Structure formats: C-alpha cells, structure tokens
Amino acid sequence: MYSDVFCKVYNEFGWNYYPEIFGEQLLEWIKRNNLNVKSSLDLACGTGVLCEIMHDYGADAWGMDFSSGMIDIAKNRNGNIHYDVADMTVYRPDRKFDLVTCTGDAVNHIAELSDVEKIFENVYAYTAEGGYFVFDLLNENEVSDSEPFEMDFTDTMKVWFQMTRPAENKVNLCIRVFEEGKDTFEENIRETIHDPMAICQLLKKCGFSSVTCSDRLLSDAENHSTTWFVVAGK
C-alpha cells in the first residue's frame, strides 16, 4: 500500500496528466464505437481523476484502489462518486458495469499471472453483457534504465525519480523526497512486465469474446510509447 507521503506527491505533483489524457481518448473511443456507457468502474483508480471524467460524462462512476490514502484524496476531490478500498484479486462488487478500466500500468503491479487471472475472472463477472474492459500494460521494448529526474515540489522540497530494470522482466520506479536538502523519504514501486500475448490469452480463457492489443487506443492518436492498450469485450 502506498504511503501517505507518496499519495500526496502523486496528487500534487502533476501525475494526473495520464488519466486526463487517457480520459479524453476514452470518451472519444466511446463515441466512435457508439457505446451507451451508463456505468463505469476504474480499478486502481488512484486519486479518482478518471472516475471524475466518467462522472462528468454522465455515467454512474465507481472507483477502487488498494491504497486508503489514494481513496481518501479521491473522496475529498468528489464526494458524489462511490469509492472502495480493496484488493483487485478478490474485489467483486454485487453489480455490473458497462465499462471497466484499469490504467497507470496497474496490472503490472501484479507479479504473478495466476493473480492476474483472478482479477480477469472477477472483472468478467462484473462486466455487463456487451460491456468492455479497457486497460494498459507496460511495453517491454520501451522501458529501460533512466538517469535520475528531479523536479521542484515546493520551495523547500524536491522530488527525485528514477526507473531501473533490476531483472529481465522487472521494473523499479524509485521516488525520493528531499526537504531542505535532506533525503527524507524513499518509496520503490516494483512492477512486472507481462507478455501481452499471454495477457490476451488469459482474457479469452476467462470468457471475454473479443480481445485486441495495440500501442494506441485510437488508431489516429499519438501512441503512448511505453504502453500497450488492451480492449476486451464481453
């Protein structure tokens, strides 16, 4: 579970840009496919940015995240959206959704394919007939070791980011916080790179009838180079 410090950094340091960009493309994808999305669920929703976008679109938007700190921030941002603190491997709400999403390479936070399969089984159970599950995955060919990247957080606080590849199919994102020049906090987010073909096969095994994987959600949109987009229809 993310620490309170990381949740604050995530919320205030501009990491909303990805769900905002994805949300714009998702709404266009819904429009182009002539979908009637009355309900949506965002898994690993973080601070709830995509939930807010779907709420403003007019859907009955829900969100869930393993981190109570993220959900606290999401609830403070918009108290009209239903949020749950839960583990995706066991989360199975007693209702169905027209659209289920999971972004920010959250599936890559799950190390074992057996646990990914549990998530897919759950998602299939609460996806409505004719509904869709849309999520992203890290693209192995586009993820490599990086030099530390530093940004000012406040006048006295800096945040330092670095991505490394400690093993063949592993990624580590290190976040360090410096206050008045002192190293005060460090968090490491460990992810596993999954074979997109294996992921697509798992989705079909769990019952999804149509599965596609591409480097972009919209054919004419700029691709997000580190990401695969997977669309699974029920």
Annotate each predicted stretch with a short phrase.
Residues M1-N36:
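Conserved class I S-adenosyl-L-methionine
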Residues L41, G48-V90:
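Class I SAM-dependent methyltransferase SAM/SAH-binding core
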Residues R92-L99:
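A short acidic, Gly/Pro-enriched loop at the edge of an enzyme's catalytic core
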Residues T103-D105:
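Residues lining the SAM
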Residues N108-I110:
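A short His-aromatic
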Residues E117-E129:
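A short glycine-rich, Lys/Arg-flanked "PGG" loop and its adjoining helix->strand segment in the class I
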Residues V134-L202:
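SAM-dependent methyltransferase
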Residues A198-K234:
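C-terminal lobe and adjacent flexible extensions of AdoMet/dcAdoMet transferase-like proteins
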